[in-house]
Curated annotation (Swiss-Prot):
Domain Carrier per the UniProt entry, residue ranges: 803-871
Record's protein name: D-lysergyl-peptide-synthetase subunit 2
Functional pathway: Alkaloid biosynthesis; ergot alkaloid biosynthesis
This protein's UniProt keywords: Ligase, Phosphopantetheine, Phosphoprotein, Transferase
Encoding gene, per UniProt annotation: lpsB
Modified residues (O-(pantetheine 4'-phosphoryl)serine): S835
Organism per entry: Claviceps purpurea (Ergot fungus)
Comment block on domains: NRP synthetases are composed of discrete domains (adenylation (A), thiolation (T) or peptidyl carrier protein (PCP) and condensation (C) domains) which when grouped together are referred to as a single module. Each module is responsible for the recognition (via the A domain) and incorporation of a single amino acid into the growing peptide product. Thus, an NRP synthetase is generally composed of one or more modules and can terminate in a thioesterase domain (TE) or reductase domain (R) that releases the newly synthesized peptide from the enzyme.
Family of the protein in this entry: Belongs to the NRP synthetase family.
SMART domains assigned: PKS_PP
């Protein structure tokens, strides 16, 4: 009788074999079982005859067949499972190893002895495998097979039923092969597969059962080679053929032609926005044409490769487009890579010249015989000479099949290999890429990727083809201040690796619409962090397929390894050892990509190209006529019945780290060169179970100095103590030298983080290097263990001051260490840091007010040195300005003038600062009309209110909020000023409420009037210069809190005033937004000098419930709805009107709780396209509004001074205002904070004033309008059309704008 220990010994070289692993079974019952049945193609007699001829039991044939099925579906070459012996109903393990050098007859013979009925050494009764019996079979496997054996007595039906129940208690999947009790030679063999519903569905179970039938049939047909076995069913073949019926078409278009069209249509639009300056589309065209002329004179044309060497710069885009116009193919080089590697790339392409920036000219001179400088004053002047010449940039000299670019990736021989992609392959990917990412001329795409990474090519060219803006950050910001750079550019689209996304916070990027994750697998928590904020696109692909061969829009439930292909190309899964054999759905195989996106191959490497870019297999040629090239990806995947693809692993030793492809053989080659004493070397990507520690490259080196004389058996049974050598002082002294040599030869991402010396190199049972064991042993090493192998070892010294203690905390958080693991003299990178964790460290320090960059971390990696060189700076944006610091000049003079105009003693003047543009405009209107922008709000009070307590509460609110104690004056030197005074807000008791009027200049702008008769009520007279719709509820909430005894925080408005003084220049934004505006304002005034008097009112409410509404703000929906309404009324597609923005998006600390009015009135221009869907226009409106946030406080007066078009845009006569959602009343609120029509009328100065409120699912619109300009019938029609437009926008975001306009027309 066997024991668990005996099983473990028997299966020690085998990893647990768990099956099934499908992708689409969520929500299924995980406990109940179901069965499917198939019949064997051949009679049982044929099976017996074959087994007799081979000298093996029938059970052995069945076991090997099941092993073949498991190998296909799990991807494991070593499979194991349970076998039920019919003679005694015991359970025994079966192990089968499939290797390329073994034929089927050898495998059958090897399985005969352990599975023989005469051998019971490994038998265990089923009861001993239960939970109560001591240990679980699932420790080893979760599938079981049982069937008839020669010479054994057939089990009875009762015994079979009992055994089946026992098996189902132990295993997730049971396969039974049974033969009816009839004449054996003629009987039909049945295969019954019983499975847990939670693990697979019926169609999947049926496919597995049919695969078992196919495996048995292939064995008894006499096939010897496993790579000739076909487990594919006709149903699976038919399904895959349907999925892959249509290929994407080749395109004859040219990328530079598509870009040139935008240069013609929108010459003034920004094409490239860089840290070093911007280029309009006109400048992009002219400067790249200049580069083209220079390159053509130097012999650049089709199939000539031109290396481009730039730091992150706007000029790199000019260089790329210039090479393309010249007809050549470009290669982007990263100057951070070792010169030796850059030279090898230039030598590989026989580079005639290098196009370089001024800064990289010296490095470029060492790479080729000629350097063309692009950028800088001299080079720019040279390119400018070509402006005005005949622009033959669209002359077609490069054909679609010609090379567009080459990307060099890691090569197993130690030399980078160049992947060549043509114009046609890039263009084939373009339509799907633009659609998937929703790129258009409003997109601002952040170019983060290294120039050595092909994603940067797509970021640039796809954006320009769409008419968008390429945003180029600096190298310094890329490593030190990524968050700020993304914010600065108003980024809408961001492509990064999941590793980089991990250190970013979605909440920091209000303008971001889409994040593209690629290069490596995403963790589920990372996806969830992003999918709730922006669209998440996960790209799967290879440089050989123009980056994107499969794309997926992920949702919260997406598997982190699941990808979907919807790219116009075709994907197939084949036997990894034989691409002439298709795999069944759900089985593991190598992914093949077919279609126009497939590149041309490897540069000057015919052998590698022929292995990877193959002619269509025979099965594919049967499907479609004509030959096509198919790319063998080297990725092992499985495709489910819903077409989703699950990545399993790499077929070869190629891995990806932080998005970069690494051929481990290349790294091993250079490690051997750096360590001459090395006899064996293995490099592996180690994934640490601790999520806070990122994956890292490790090198395992066996040298003649450390190697022990171990037997083959010892190497097969190696443990961590036996494998790893002690890190001697001699070894540590060499680490720095070895690392330096590797950095000279390899990019930083390919340099191993740790080099581990070995005593022995462990082997598998087949005497191959046991890479899996090395990965397992290395992953189990603690941080302390790894530190022993670092070049420097320091004695622990505790931090000696507050700054060092702060940096100890930063180190701990960035690296995922405890404080006691970090000393003052510890080295950041020795503790496991890298460039990404340095970015995280810098971000933490900046939040704590330390002026720290990633460059500082690299310059001073020791904790104490970094602390010593880092300054603690005051973040002024987080502090309130000191009084009288926001205007220049003599404080005494300013105070004296303020006191005189306010008729107050100088001692009560608390502060003076400029008025906002909004306040200036409101005060000007009130000087013309005393009632303009003055609200009179009645607040009914309960009878039991304590009036003294209420008065004290109001005094507390006024004390905490200086804006309520603010007066306005005019200074000849400074214009309109705000004066904060130390006084109580006027509290007047009078029954003649209407007789109390506000005096604007030099007097209080807030009055509280207590009326006692006929009922007690509180009246608030307040000028709009000191409140807005957002701050009014805040004020009443504070009054409630103070009445109930709460202490109020001090909230001065001066921080917002300081922000206004430092706003960026808004000229470009508003001029661009208003450019070419010719539509008349709406509604038309009787004559230009007419001042509207809104004396009429209309209301309308409409239900707008929709599941699609959350992607865009209610404000965006209302803006589009009114634009459609106005466009229909005017018969124009280019409309404009005024809108009021909250202003609360400004980057001012605590702005959400300030009572100062931050609203701003701005022109809103919307150009409709009848052929565009609603979603696209919504996206454009919200994007324009988001990009306008930094410029919205400039004021209408200033905007109107920016040119004729801008002045016309400010002449609107319709104002749209989205009211804040009503604040829910608290049970302790002693008055109702809702406001009356007086609020509306205070804001209404245009011909049409629309006040919109969205509560629950209802949009309520109140219109105050001038009845002499707009008739009642017209206003009602406008409101009804507004409601109809809102409903259609919400209901169907894919509806075309033209269809909504038609529906409004049909209502007439």
């Amino acid at each position: 009788m066997a024991t668990p220990e005996k099983w473990r010994k028997y299966l020690e070289d085998y990893i647990p074999c768990s099956f099934p692993t499908f992708l689409d079974n969520e929500g299924a019952d995980s406990k109940s079982f179901a069965s499917v049945l198939v019949r064997l193609e051949h009679p049982y007699g044929r099976l017996m005859s074959f087994s007799n001829n081979c000298g093996v039991d029938v059970a052995v044939v069945l076991n090997v067949a099941w092993g073949i099925v498991l190998q296909a579906y799990t991807g494991q070459d070593a499979t194991c499972f349970a076998v039920i012996a019919e003679s005694n109903l015991n359970i025994r393990p079966c192990r089968i190893r499939f290797t390329s050098d073994k034929v089927v007859s050898d495998i059958l013979s090897a399985c005969q002895s352990p599975c023989s009925e005469k051998t019971g050494d490994h038998d265990i009764p089923a009861s001993h495998l239960s939970q109560d019996g001591g240990f679980l079979a699932s420790e080893f496997f979760n599938t079981c097979i049982w069937g008839p054996m020669q010479g054994s007595q057939m089990t009875s039906e009762t015994q079979a039923a009992d055994m089946n129940r026992n098996a189902l208690n132990l295993f997730d999947l049971v396969t039974r092969v049974e033969v009816p009790r009839v004449e054996v030679d003629k009987s039909i063999t049945r295969i019954t597969l019983t499975y847990k519903r939670g693990l697979m569905r019926e169609h999947q179970a049926l496919a597995v059962a049919k695969a078992m039938e196919r495996a048995i049939s292939e064995i008894i047909s006499g096939k010897e080679r496993l790579d000739q076995f076909c487990l594919l069913t006709s149903e699976d073949r038919r399904q895959m053929s349907l999925w892959n019926m249509n290929l994407s078409d080749n395109s004859d278009a040219r990328i530079e032609t598509l870009i040139h069209e935008w240069c013609r249509r929108t010459p003034s639009a920004v094409a490239v926005c860089g840290w070093d300056g911007d280029f309009s589309y006109k400048e992009l065209n002219e400067l790249s044409t200049g580069v083209k002329h220079d390159l053509r004179h130097l012999g650049i044309g089709p199939e000539v490769f031109v290396p481009i060497l730039f730091e992150k710069s706007r000029w790199a885009v000019i260089a790329m487009l210039g090479v393309m116009k010249a007809g050549g193919a470009f290669i982007l080089l990263d100057p951070a890579h070792p010169p030796k590697r850059l030279r090898s790339i230039c030598d590989k392409v026989s580079a005639r010249l290098v196009v370089s920036s001024v800064q990289q000219a010296d490095l470029a001179a060492g790479l080729a015989g000629h350097v063309v400088i692009v950028g800088g004053e001299v080079a720019t002047a040279g390119m400018a000479q070509h402006v005005g010449e005949h622009d033959d940039s669209m002359d077609c000299i490069a054909a679609p099949h010609n090379a567009l670019y080459a990307v060099f990736t890691s090569g197993s021989t130690g030399t980078p290999k160049g992947v060549v992609n043509s114009h046609s392959s890039f263009l084939a990917a373009m339509p799907v890429y633009l659609k998937a990412l929703e790129l258009d001329n409003n997109s601002r795409v952040f170019q983060f990727a290294s120039y050595a990474f092909d994603v940067t090519i797509f970021d640039a060219l796809m954006t320009l083809v769409a008419g968008g803006c390429v945003c180029v950050l600096s190298n310094a910001d890329r490593s030190s201040d990524l968050t700020s750079a993304i914010q600065h550019f108003g980024t809408t689209h961001l492509s990064v690796t999941p590793t980089v996304a991990r250190i970013l916070d979605p909440q920091d990027f209000p303008s971001l619409k889409t994040i593209v994750l690629g290069g490596e697998l995403s963790a589920s928590d990372e996806l969830l962090k992003w999918v709730n904020n922006v669209r998440v696109i996960r790209l799967y692909g290879a440089s050989e397929c123009t980056v994107m061969s499969i794309q997926c829009t992920s949702g919260p439930a997406s598997s982190i390894k699941t990808i979907n292909y919807e790219t116009g190309n075709c994907c197939w899964v084949v036997n990894p050892q034989n691409h002439e054999q298709l795999r069944p759905l759900g089985a593991v195989g190598e992914l093949l990509v077919e279609g126009a996106v497939v590149g041309r191959g490897y540069l000057d490497d015919a052998s590698q190209t022929s292995e990877t870019f193959i002619e269509a297999p025979a099965w594919l040629q049967e499907l479609r006529q004509g030959s096509s090239t198919v790319y063998k990806s080297g990725d092992l995947v499985r495709i489910a019945a819903d077409k989703s693809v699950q990545f399993v692993c790499r077929k070869s030793t190629q891995v990806k780290l932080r998005g970069q492809r690494i051929e481990l053989g290349e790294v091993e080659h250079h490690v051997r060169l750096a360590i001459p004493s090395a006899t064996e070397c293995v490099v592996e990507l180690i994934t640490i179970p601790d999520a806070s520690r990122p994956p890292m490259l490790m090198a395992f080196v066996l040298s003649d100095t450390d190697a022990s004389t171990s037997s083959i058996t010892a190497r097969r049974n190696a443990t961590s103590d036996a494998v790893f050598a002690e890190p001697s002082a001699s070894f540590r002294s060499q680490i720095a030298s070895i690392t330096s040599k590797l950095r000279d030869a390899l990019p930083s991402y390919m340099v191993p983080s740790v080099i581990l010396p070995l005593r022995i190199m462990p082997l598998t049972g087949t005497d191959k290097i046991n890479r899996k064991l090395l990965r397992q042993l290395a992953a189990a090493l603690s941080r302390e263990d790894l530190q022993l192998y670092q070049a420097q070892q320091t004695t622990y010294r505790a931090p000696s001051n507050d700054i060092e203690e702060a940096f100890q905390r930063f180190f701990a958080q960035a690296l995922g260490l405890s404080l006691d693991q970090i000393g003052a003299d510890d080295h950041f990178f020795s503790l496991g840091g890298d460039s990404l964790t340095a970015m995280r460290l810098a971000a933490m320090a900046r939040k704590a007010k330390f002026d720290l960059t990633v460059q500082n971390v690299f310059d001073h990696p020791e904790l104490s040195e970094l602390a010593r060189h880092t300054k603690l700076v005051a973040d002024e944006s987080q502090e309130f300005p000191q009084p009288f610091t926001l205007i220049a000049g003599s404080k005494q003079g300013i105070v004296r003038d303020a006191a005189r105009q306010c008729r107050l003693p100088s001692r009560v003047i608390e502060d003076v600062y400029p008025c906002t543009p909004l306040q200036k405009g409101l005060l000007a209107e009130t000087m013309r009309d005393a009632a303009a922008f003055v609200a009179k709000i009645e607040v009914p009070l309960p009878r039991d209110v304590d009036l003294d307590r209420l008065r004290q509460a109001w005094a507390a609110v006024a004390k905490a909020n200086p804006i309520l104690r603010t007066r306005m004056i005019f200074s000849p030197s400074y214009g309109m000023l705000q004066v904060v005074v130390r006084e109580d807000v006027p509290w007047i008791e009078s029954d003649e409420v209407e007789s109390q009027e506000l005096v604007v200049v030099g007097r209080s702008l807030v009055q509280l009037i207590l009326r006692r008769r006929p009922s007690t009520a509180l009246f608030l007279h307040i000028h709009h210069a000191v409140y807005d719709g957002y701050s009014l509820p805040l004020m009443f909430a504070q009054l409630n809190n103070a009445y109930h005894g709460e202490t109020l925080a001090f909230r001065p408005a001066s921080a917002f005033i300081r922000y206004l003084a430092t706003m960026p220049d808004a000229t470009d934004y508003w001029q661009s937004m208003c450019q070419g505006l010719e539509s008349p304002s709406f509604p038309a005034l009787p004559h230009p000098s007419h001042r509207p008097h809104p004396d009429s009112k209309a209301t309308h409410t409409v239900c707008v419930a929709s599941p699609h509404a959350r992607e865009y703000t209610p404000n965006t929906h209302v803006r589009l709805a009114w634009a459609i309404t106005q466009a229909h009324e005017q018969g124009l597609l280019d409309v404009f009107y005024g809108t009021v923005v909250s202003g609360r998006n400004a980057p001012v600390d605590q702005i959400e709780s300030m009572l100062i009015p931050t609203v701003a009135t701005v022109p809103c221009r919307i150009t409709l396209d009848v052929d565009s869907p609603v979603r696209k226009i919504l996206h454009r409106i919200q994007d324009v509004a988001t990009r306008g946030i930094p410029f919205e406080q400039i004021g209408l007066a200033e905007i109107s001074h920016l040119g004729k078009d801008a002045a016309h845009a400010c002449s609107f006569q319709t104002l749209l205002l989205m009211q804040p959602t009503a604040v829910e009343q608290n049970e302790n609120d002693f008055f109702n904070t809702s406001t009356s029509d007086a609020n509306y009328r205070a804001d209404a100065t245009y011909a049409i004033n629309l006040f919109c409120t969205l509560e629950n699912q209802d949009l309520s619109v109140t219109a105050l309008y001038d009845g002499n300009i707009v008739s009642t019938d017209t206003m009602q029609r406008l409101l009804q059309n507004l409601g109809k437009s809102m409903q259609e926008i919400h209901a169907a975001p894919r509806t075309l704008i033209g269809d909504i306009l038609k529906s409004l027309h049909s209502r007439l």
